[in-house]
Amino acid sequence: PDTGVLKGYCYAAPWKARAAYRYTVETSIYLDANDRSKGFGNRLYTELLQRLQAQNIHSAVGILALPNPHSIRLHEKLGFEYAGCVKEAGFKFDRWIDVVYWQRILSHRIVSP
């Protein structure tokens, strides 16, 4: 049932400002800790990916702060592939955190500039 309580959200933003990267987006998803592993993330992300494909987006890059086993499992389940790690890229919770990149190619079509 719809309780009117926000369970989470996801969005996409341009990956880089330069025109050459206009077909790649950075994706983010946030879920309430009590609502993980209940299918909300899968439904949200699936809808986002469908909308991105409809907008002719070629590649989606999920950027995850570590540790984050729930988000890694979600990205794997949705067909993302591990694409790299940046060590100590951020600082939160009084410590340095590594960031990993997970990427999914949405379309192999060649787009005319």
Which stretches of residues belong to each language-model region?
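Short hydrophobic/aromatic beta-strand or adjacent loop that forms the aromatic wall/cage
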Residues: E26, I97-Y101
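Conserved catalytic-core motifs of GNAT/GCN5-like acyltransferases
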Residues: Y11, V61-L64, E76, E81-D98, ...
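Conserved acetyl-CoA-binding loop-helix of GNAT-fold acetyltransferases
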Residues: L31, S37-A54, S59, P69-K77
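Conserved hydrophobic beta-strand within the GNAT/NAT acetyltransferase core sheet
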Residues: T27-I29, A60-I63
